[in-house]
Amino acid sequence: MSDPASTSIPAHATNGEAHAPNDHHHAQLPLSDSKPVSVNRKKQKRRQKQAARLAAERQFGNGHISADMSEQNGLSPTAPASHVSDDHDLDERANGETYYEEIHDATHDLDDHPPNLSNGQPGQQNATARKSKKKKGKKNRAGSQTMGDESSTPLSTPSVSMSQHLPPPLPSHLPHTLLKTSKDRSIWNTSTQEERENIKTFWLELGEEERRQLVKVEKDAVLKKMKEQQKHSCSCTVCGRKRTAIEEELEVLYDAYYEELEQYANNNQGSFEKGPPMVPPPRLYHPPLRSPGQHTRTQGQFHPSRGRIHELPEDDEDLEEDYDEDDEDDEPYSDDEYEDEETRAARADFFAFGNSLTVKGRRQIMLLSFIFPKPVTNLIFTLADGILTVADDLLKNDGKHFIDMMEQLAERRMQREEDTQYGIAAAHQSLHGGHNHGPLDDDDYDEEEDEDYDSQEDEDYEEDEMVSSGNWPGGDAVQADSFLQDAMTEEQRMEEGRRMFQIFAARMFEQRVLTAYREKVAEQRQQKLIEELMEEQTRNEQRNAKKAREAQKRKDKKKLQKQAKEEEKARREAEKAAEEAAAKAEQEKKLEEQRRKREEQKKKREAERKAQEAERLRKEAEKQKRLREERERQAEIERKQREQKELEKKRREEARQNELREKKTKDERERKLREAAPKTDYEGQEKRDPQAKRVSHTGPVPIPASLQHAQALPAYLQSPHYQIATPIVPKAPTPARPRQPSQQGSHTSSPRSQPASTEPSQVSISPRSMAPSQSSGASSVTSKQGHGQPPLLHHPQPSTPLSPLGALNRSHPPGFSPSNPPGLGLVARPPIGHELPSYPPHSGPLMNQLRGFPAPNGLPVLPGMNGTRPMPPGRGFPLDPGHGLAFHQQPIANAFAAQPSGLSHAHSRQPSSSFERSPLDAHAFPISRPSPIKRPSSTQQDQNNRSAQRDVDDLSAHLGSSALLDDSDVPFTSNLSQSLPGATAPGTLPGPTRASFAGTSLFADPLAAKHSGFPIGPSVGNTWSTQIPFGTSPFPSAPTWGTGPGSGWSNNAFAPGGHHRAHTSRPVTIRLLVIQACKQLNMMSPSKGASGYHDVKVVLRQVDQLRPVNEPPISLKEMLDICDTEGNSQNGGGSFSIRSDETGECVKFEPDTNSASSGHRGSIVPGEIGSPVPSSSLPAFGGIGSSTPSVLRQFSSPTGF
């Protein structure tokens, strides 16, 4: 709504116009005079100013509304409320329909009321303000809303009875408590019935003293205001009497009214259904009940609104029944019903000033219309409306209107009394007084009383002016008053005045009771509001606390969840850390285990290495020990030999001296005997001399056929040292007693292998070798004579140094042809026996005296020379012709028996013979080294010699290597040659040692050559024939270089090939065999390469294939033990690696620098550098056709082919 201050008060309706009572009805009342009147500009200006002031007051009042009222109306204390919202309350019925009580307010409807009508024309502005208002044709219905600026009566000013517009709907921001049902909100918004019941209850609850206090307060307030107003007024008797009359009238009215109220309350308590009777018994009016809209007003605010008009039925039923507005309300008023309409409007306006005052029935309402004429009735109601207007403004204007009204009434009463007493009728005195007091002029209110009066007062006086000026006959108030007085009797006028006082008193009392009730309701509502606020605050606090608790719970829950998550995370991290720690520990454990295993392996390897080193050192120590022992033994042997030589030398010196003495004595005795002895004795002596010479010089003994080659030693196999010169003294032979040979075993390295001759024997002084008689002839075996063949005699070596010309001075044994002259290298033709089988073969000289140029008819060439092999022993048929032979080789028939390959156990010493045996029996004994020719020794001397030899035998049994043996140990014998220097294999061809001077050939014999048992070759015959300079292949089918036998020159231009001694021991031999077996397996298995491993069993089989037939079988353990030895230049070099796997043990040979030199010693394997192509006629160094490994050159089979 727009601000009331900004708009002017609308003009009043002219005659024939009526304001619309509400939004639904536009009642038009017929006007008695439609003539326009002039506008009083002064009053209009005053009305405008009053409207502006009223608007400002309303706005100021609306800004100071108490908290409970503002809460009830939905307005804030500071918000300026419109007059519409200040004039009504809300009431929500059960069905939710908003109920608005009709409220009559003194405010003006500024912009929402329907436009005024002028002469039936809508929208026409009324330009006159002094024209008399007509009554409106229709009163407000029950439930209709009228604006505050429209009057409910035609005689009331528009400011008094303003129609009220329909308020807007409830806003959505109102408190929730305002939207509750009426039952729950009874303390805030109550219906009319509930309000009446509450007021009645409040009045009944008051005590008598409180009720009198209320009435007294009203009376005192009115009197006090009146005294204050009359303080500066006239103090004449008339005015004094008037004041007294007013006081008395008020006291009477209030007392009587209170009595009537008390009587009515006592008599009619509980006798009504919808509410208490609002009017006491006839003539008595009690304070009417206010509508709910009036309960929101406080003292000093707006006018109390007027609710519905209720009427009491004739049968005294409840006065709360709403006035029936259906009869003649909806129809517009017509001219025919003017009177009725005017009467009805007057009645409605009359009862409107009492604000819900009711009368005893319609008849009483219509009574005034019948009693008074129409103009008088209008005037009365005009005055009544003015009185009510003053009553409504009492609290706002400090009761000034009421006081003025009372003064007027008092003046009228005094006038009536004077008229009664003096018979003077002056109607105009009733209004303005009659004691020289001029009537109230409108100008008195212009400036002085503007703040105390509102527009309603202006309307009142305006109405008065209108009534006096144009609405009544006579044109002024005096005429109207006279007319009224003329029309009414004095009693009626008094009764009407009293009734007016009663109405006003009831109105004032009603205001006071309602004020008290409102204060109580306000207090209750304030308390309730406080309670509700407290409850709301409590609820809010509880809600906030609940929210806080819920938030705390959520927070705690989130915290717990977070804590649980953190715990879960920590647990997972702990588990992960534990797993990592376990994995790390496991890894550490594995690493530690691996380290431990590596350490163990390292320690094991270290232990193995240490063990191997210790074993190597042990073996080395053993080897050194053996070498040391060997050297010691050799030194001991040499020492013994030197001692023996010295001893022999001494004995020889003694023997020479003895022989000289004996010779001298013998010569003397012989001379004497010759002189004295007969001639027969001389012949017998001559007969004995050749026998003694044979025994002492040559020592002819039967020799076995198999050992003839060992007994007939060539000169180049003897020691290179010069023999001790011993003069040859012819002596008579001294036969010795035959002696049983000793059955003790003799070692080749033992001193017992020396000849046991009683004469000093030839001893080699070489540190490395021994004489062939000590090696090959050391073991003598008693052989049997067979076929009656004459034995071949052993030719002893001369004691003196060999001379190149010594062969010329020597005699030849029987059956041997003499040698050629020295230096020519020519030999005589062998005897015919070589060509004829009936003669035994005879060889030429055993050795040419010229070193390096042997005689062709001397010793035969080595096997394999000139393409033929030597005749094996015992062969009785000649060789096939050809093969380079000039003629058949005559076999040596049964001349030499085959010798077994074993060692003989016969003693090597010459047994003594008795004097009784025949000299021929001596051939049955093994031949021994021939002793120098000397005089036969005596028996005693022979015994001394045997004792000395026995001492030497005992010494050899306890010294040397035999000293290391236990008494129960049996000396180990081997077919292979021992590792002693100078030792040769028994049964092989005797040859020179490496230190010998027997003319070692530059071209050694082939390793595959088979040595015969007797060194007689086919190189006999013509000495001047061509010879093969280098030798021939050992095989018969191989081509030869040169002619066959029969030539006079030797097969070898540089001397016969000497045999190398087999100096290796069995471990060295086995190691060399294993090396060669590995090499052959590498060549046979090229996929494995030269450094591959071979199974030990395969290697053992290969070694067995390479092993000589006369070598004992080699075991696997022995071979593996030999493989552990370190290699050097003697055993083939290199090293062996042995590994073990699931298939077994494997061995690999790893060569080094020593293995290369040892693999080519005197032999070249086919396929190597320097080896000849197979079946080629070109000779190679070391022999042609050598197919056996070089290891086989160290030893040879002692047998034949």
UniProtKB/Swiss-Prot annotation:
Coarse class of the protein's main subcellular location: cytoplasm
Quote the biased-composition stretches of kind Acidic residues, using this chain's numbering: 313-341, 441-466
This chain's protein is named Stress response protein nst1
Organism whose genome encodes this protein: Aspergillus niger (strain ATCC MYA-4892 / CBS 513.88 / FGSC A1513)
Keywords assigned by UniProt, alphabetized: Coiled coil, Cytoplasm, Stress response
Q: One Pfam family, please name it.
A: NST1
Annotated function: May act as a negative regulator of salt tolerance.
Which residues fall in a coiled-coil region? 520-673
Q: InterPro entries, per this entry?
A: Fungal_stress_NST1, NST1
Indicate where this protein resides in the cell: Cytoplasm
* Gene encoding the protein: nst1
Which region ranges are annotated with the description Disordered?
A: 1-178, 268-341, 429-478, 535-707, 724-848, 899-952, 1150-1169
Q: Specify residue ranges for compositional bias: Polar residues.
A: 116-128, 145-164, 293-302, 740-767
Which stretches are tagged as biased composition: Basic residues? 40-50, 130-141
GO CC annotations on file:
cytoplasm
Q: Its family?
A: Belongs to the NST1 family.
UniProt keyword annotation of Coiled coil present: yes
Basic and acidic residues: bias regions: 84-114, 535-553, 563-692
Bias-annotated ranges (Low complexity): 769-805, 926-938
